[in-house]
A protein has these predicted regions:
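Eukaryote-biased recognition of intrinsically disordered, low-complexity regulatory segments
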Residues: 3-24
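Short, contiguous acidic and Ser/Thr-rich linear segments
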Residues: 21-33
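Ferredoxin-type iron-sulfur electron-transfer modules in oxidoreductases and energy-metabolism complexes
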Residues: 32-47, 92-256
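A short, aromatic/hydrophobic, helix- or strand-capping loop or linear motif
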Residues: 48-54
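Short, structured protein-protein interaction patches enriched in aromatics and acidic/basic residues
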Residues: 55-64
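Extracellular/mature segments of secreted proteins
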Residues: 63, 82-85, 226
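Glycine-rich phosphate/adenylate-binding loop and adjacent beta-alpha elements
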Residues: 70-91
Length: 256
């Protein structure tokens, strides 16, 4: 088995202590992911290193960090793809969140913003299958047995959100305005808006989007969409909200 000796530079912070970087050298398989390197540091060198991990296949979002300054999921990022073979591979916590310890951040703000839209992160748009799917693909099933909701592709793209916080970390506006609803929060508002025609509900949601810390604070950098590991396209959702708000404004100006 081909092995790599990788110097891993980890951001360290404990409450009451000054932040610093510690570098550890770990030997890992050439096909290993960054989370495997962090695991090796914890197992071999220092069990005080704090980090989150879960599924190991990009479905839970808990491990999200910055790798060489770029927001990524270390569970699906191979070391060989991000390490130059010489300099230490740097791992740091996400930006725009309070740091709890080392690579662990407090993501409470992310969920608070998403809850502003009463957004339940449940994949309601998944295909309903009245039987257990084992080794065959959904695409191979009889279409008559698969019930897909209207506009399935649009809904499923948003509901692939794994609440990792990467979009919030990548967003330049979040660094300047801590009250900004953020890409995840505004994407949730957009999705909730698309699910309702109730006038009161629509006014509430668009009022949030049109507020001081809503869509107009976005700098249209599209960093959130670029960084999103699940192709949710939060920037596209923000632009869609802007278009609806502008259309409503023109409608009112025309007296309709």
């Amino acid at each position: 088995m081909n092995m790599l000796k990788v110097p891993l530079q980890i951001f360290r912070y404990k409450p009451g202590q000054a932040p610093r970087y510690d570098t550890f050298t770990v030997e890992i398989p050439a096909a290993a992911h960054v989370i495997d390197a962090i695991d090796a540091v914890w197992a071999i060198h220092d069990q005080s290193v704090a980090f989150r991990r879960g599924c190991h296949h990009s479905s839970c979002g808990s491990c999200a960090i910055r790798i060489n300054g770029v927001e990524k999921l270390p569970c699906i990022t191979r070391v060989a793809d991000v390490w130059d073979g010489h300099d230490p591979l740097r791992v740091e916590p996400l930006r725009n969140f309070p740091i709890v310890s080392d690579l662990v951040v407090d993501v409470t703000g992310l969920f608070q913003r998403m809850s502003a839209a009463d957004m339940s992160m449940i994949c309601e748009a998944e295909a309903f299958l009245p039987f257990t799917v084992d080794t065959f693909a959904v695409a191979d099933l009889d279409p008559k047995l698969v019930e897909l909701p209207e506009n399935f592709s649009r809904f499923s793209r948003f509901e692939k959100c794994i609440e990792c916080g990467i979009c919030v970390s990548a967003c330049p506006t979040m660094a300047a305005d801590e009250k900004f609803l953020g890409p995840a929060g505004l994407a949730a508002i957009h999705q909730a808006r698309k699910k309702t025609d109730d006038p009161v509900r629509v006014e509430h949601l668009l009022g949030l989007a049109n507020g001081e810390h809503g869509v107009w604070r976005c700098h249209s950098a599209f960093e959130c969409t670029e960084a999103c590991p699940q192709a949710v396209d939060p920037a596209g959702k923000i632009m869609a909200l802007r278009r609806e708000l502008i259309a409503r404004r023109f409608t009112k100006m025309m007296g309709k």
